[in-house]
Amino acid sequence: MSFFPELYFNVDNGYLEGLVRGLKAGVLSQADYLNLVQCETLEDLKLHLQSTDYGNFLANEASPLTVSVIDDKLKEKMVVEFRHMRNHAYEPLASFLDFITYSYMIDNVILLITGTLHQRSIAELVPKCHPLGSFEQMEAVNIAQTPAELYNAILVDTPLAAFFQDCISEQDLDEMNIEIIRNTLYKAYLESFYKFCTLLGGTTADAMCPILEFEADRRAFIITINSFGTELSKEDRAKLFPHCGRLYPEGLAQLARADDYEQVKNVADYYPEYKLLFEGAGSNPGDKTLEDRFFEHEVKLNKLAFLNQFHFGVFYAFVKLKEQECRNIVWIAECIAQRHRAKIDNYIPIF
């Protein structure tokens, strides 16, 4: 039986894989986007979305509709779909789905700490957190003054505790330390998720490893570019690079020595797919940003996950494609609301 994993994959996971493939069929097409960008008002946008799989998800919202309400409802719909899958998942799929939520938990913790640093009330901040990364202790984050307090009082009983070992210090939480904590948590998270996927092996590893390798490398590039002109030393910068990407080890060593954007671009030149991304990015009006090029490549990798069956990668890919779809709809909605149509086509097409 071990020679035919698909025979027993469907016993525990067949229903959910069928479900996620059905949900993926409802991802907006290019024709849908062409309709959305022609909308004159957010009410028009709502009507067009009703003709898609989103249906009446905005039916109970009073006029005038706002972009923030659309954003909240998009996230809410995605979370309902995800939690349905999580509630019906057996191990090891249950743990795999939990791993997907950890990145949102990290983002929520950082958002709460940063907001508290700027004297924002916790009641104002919690609604801004992503519902996929919510956890019981979230509202107590504002009591922590140092990373050690943050860990001991709040995060020790959450899944993030395992990723926090390299962040514990008695230094005060300031802007620089918060960014270091964010990137250290993401490094530990990505390396742990990568290890989990390699242990699962098979088609899941084949689908997930390239996706996580790209995510690790993207973070290394962005950390390097964002560190220019800051107080972050090259040694500290190197400690933040995830070690599960294709850049490890030679590319990361070169990034650690980089002094400007051109030197980062030179590192990318050694990796054909990254070279293409950097060459396609520019800072002139009408050019795509490097971030957009990264998003496009991420969409491409996630679409590839659906080409094979009997693996968990489709669940991760679906969440990431829906996340990009939410960004696209919110971008179009913002352009309509602000009557700034010149850049309305700057969304990332999926299908």
From Swiss-Prot:
> Record's Gene Ontology CC terms?
apical plasma membrane; axon terminus; centrosome; clathrin-coated vesicle membrane; early endosome; lysosomal membrane; proton-transporting V-type ATPase complex; proton-transporting V-type ATPase, V0 domain
What superkingdom does the record give?
Eukaryota
Residues bearing Phosphoserine? 283
What is the protein named?
A: V-type proton ATPase subunit d 1
Annotated membrane topology is: Peripheral membrane protein
Subunit relationships? V-ATPase is a heteromultimeric enzyme made up of two complexes: the ATP-hydrolytic V1 complex and the proton translocation V0 complex. The V1 complex consists of three catalytic AB heterodimers that form a heterohexamer, three peripheral stalks each consisting of EG heterodimers, one central rotor including subunits D and F, and the regulatory subunits C and H. The proton translocation complex V0 consists of the proton transport subunit a, a ring of proteolipid subunits c9c'', rotary subunit d, subunits e and f, and the accessory subunits ATP6AP1/Ac45 and ATP6AP2/PRR.
Q: Which gene is the coding source of this polypeptide chain? A: Atp6v0d1
A GO molecular function term, named singly, is: protein-containing complex binding
Q: Which Pfam families match?
A: vATP-synt_AC39
Tell me the GO BP annotations in alphabetical order.
cellular response to increased oxygen levels; cilium assembly; intracellular iron ion homeostasis; synaptic vesicle lumen acidification
**Per its UniProt record, what SUPFAM superfamilies does this chain match?**
V-type ATP synthase subunit C
Residues found modified as Phosphotyrosine? 270
Expression across tissues is: Ubiquitous.
Q: Does the keyword Chloroplast apply?
A: no
What the protein does comes down to: Subunit of the V0 complex of vacuolar(H+)-ATPase (V-ATPase), a multisubunit enzyme composed of a peripheral complex (V1) that hydrolyzes ATP and a membrane integral complex (V0) that translocates protons. V-ATPase is responsible for acidifying a variety of intracellular compartments in eukaryotic cells, thus providing most of the energy required for transport processes in the vacuolar system. May play a role in coupling of proton transport and ATP hydrolysis.
Q: What is its main location?
A: membrane
What are the alphabetically sorted keywords of the record? Cilium biogenesis/degradation, Cytoplasmic vesicle, Hydrogen ion transport, Ion transport, Lysosome, Membrane, Phosphoprotein, Transport
> What does the similarity note say?
Belongs to the V-ATPase V0D/AC39 subunit family.
This protein's record includes keyword Membrane: yes
Q: List locations, semicolon-separated.
A: Membrane; Lysosome membrane; Cytoplasmic vesicle, Clathrin-coated vesicle membrane
